[in-house]
Design a protein with these regions (language model features):
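Extracellular/periplasmic catalytic domains that process cell-envelope and extracellular macromolecules
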Residues: 176-182, 201-206, 254-257
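Active-site-proximal beta-strand/loop segments in catalytic clefts of secreted hydrolases
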Residues: 104-107, 132-134, 187-193, 214-217, ...
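A broad, low-specificity signal marking well-ordered, structured residues that form hydrophobic/aromatic
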Residues: 101, 184, 210, 261
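Structural alpha-beta junctions
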Residues: 119-131, 204-215, 237-238
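Generic low-polarity alpha-helical segments
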Residues: 37, 70-72, 118, 211-212, ...
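The catalytic-center signature of Zn2+-dependent metalloproteases
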Residues: 216-296
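Active-site scaffold of zinc-dependent metalloenzymes
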Residues: 190-227
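Propeptide-to-catalytic entry region of secreted or membrane-anchored zinc metalloproteases
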Residues: 1-182, 190-196, 228-229
Length: 296
């Protein structure tokens, strides 16, 4: 039968704990202390027997970036010289990757209480988002939005570069904030700044500036909407900072909206193990921008 491996992350030099829930059928059952967890090389994982058929594993992060399979094995009841595999999971060892992000309140956009929620999402993938919030009001000159008074959104906003109107918005706001070239910025717009189509936000891949729209219509939009502001902001940071793509663009449209992953269009917030791999891709460089595309 097919067996789907679960994935667990642990930071290099740190400790993580995993609870294994033991389910057994039949009359001949194993004592919990006869179940051994070990690496492929045979190194045993320290465990603690707990109540409710639970074994707690103590996992140590030991590598900069590596993954290994941890096996749960039991002795064969018919041949005690043999071991049987009862289960397994993949353990990912990763080194923390810190990055600086500023949430900017524009025309009253609410950024209060978002930093902790956004940072928590990425910490599970061993990435630290150092979030600064600029709560002082930054007022956009609405004249830059043109005759329709809305921010022009093109197709596939997370993939393309900034258009001329978006560059004008960036240029206007950069002059009104404490801008630092070595930080990423997400502009969180108040209700008077709307896009030309329903969209939760956008941040082109590996670009410095992201845009998030706070109205209920846009937070629940079919495109880039996550239903909650913190999740939408994290989704856009995933695109702009870490070059994460939508899972349905990678694995097929039939899964769109059907996963609990951050980069899907449903309301999930989980980073899957392939996202972890991208977060820690050594070719992924931070704060590398092209001036003409970032509104300079």
């Amino acid at each position: 039968n097919d067996y789907t491996l679960a994935h667990q992350a642990v930071e290099n030099g740190q400790t993580a704990y995993v609870d294994a829930i033991i389910e057994q059928t039949g009359s001949n059952q194993y004592a919990l202390d006869s179940i051994v967890f070990k690496t492929k090389q045979g190194e045993k994982i320290p465990v603690e027997i707990r109540g409710n058929n639970t074994i707690r594993l103590t996992l140590k992060g030991r590598y900069t970036f590596e993954n290994e399979i941890i096996y749960a094995v039991v002795p064969s009841m018919t041949d005690r010289t043999k071991q049987l595999t009862a289960g397994a999971f993949t353990l990912w060892h990763m080194t923390d990757r810190p990055v600086d992000v500023v949430l900017v309140s524009v025309n009253g956009g609410n950024v209060n209480g978002l930093a902790t929620e956004v940072a928590k999402i990425f910490k599970k993938g061993v990435a630290t988002i150092n979030i600064e919030t600029q709560t002082a009001r930054a007022e956009l000159d609405l004249a830059v939005l043109g005759d329709n008074a809305r921010l022009d959104i093109g197709d596939s906003g997370w993939l393309t570069n900034y258009n001329s109107e978006q560059k004008a918005v960036i240029a206007d706001l950069k002059n009104k904030i404490d801008y630092n070239f070595n930080k990423y910025y997400v502009f969180v717009f108040g209700g008077d700044i709307l896009p030309t189509k329903p969209i939760g936000g956008f941040m082109p891949l590996q670009r410095q500036f992201g845009f998030v729209f706070t109205s209920s219509e846009n937070q629940n939009a079919d495109e880039e909407g996550k239903g909650e502001l913190a999740k939408t902001i994290a989704h856009e940071i995933g695109h702009g900072v870490f070059a994460l793509q939508h899972p349905f663009d990678l694995y097929g449209k039939e899964i769109e909206g059907k996963t609990d992953w951050l980069m899907d269009y449903a309301n999930g917030s989980l980073l899957n193990h392939m996202d972890w791999k991208q977060l820690h891709n050594p070719e992924l460089k931070f704060y590398v921008f092209q001036d003409d595309e970032d509104g300079e």
